[in-house]
């Protein structure tokens, strides 16, 4: 939403700031990911930021997603995720990194794959044969950095999950000019968004 408002206001997406720590993770992730670099046609970068869980002690997270979109099939290939996380003092670096890697990949799964189908009030996905989570072959390159901080430690349960889908959605927009606003972002949804863009 911030990216869309920023574009409407004529500013860069990562210029839509807020708290100092949010502005810091946004600036750092943009620099780390090479925000603004030239990409081939059909590819795009999207940026997003979140904070959570407790308002008194939030974890600030920013993410840049790099995608390639096939305009014919609607297939989205997630090439890379870059995340910068400010969770205060990191007590156990290896554990923190593992937590953020897992959280980010869960975010990818929710953004591009997982979604329950219903028909006549009944769940259609009764086993993993029909319910498709993220698989090893779909795992993108991950680059995660923690902000060095003297603040007290904060949570790392889900912050890296929540930032991924909006970054991917913004990257799809950057690649195609089409907005997809519902999850999961499957090829059919991308094709509908592309068709809607052409009608506008």
Regions flagged by a language model, labelled:
Residues 1-54, 62-64, 68-200:
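C-terminal catalytic domains of large/alpha subunits in multi-subunit enzymes
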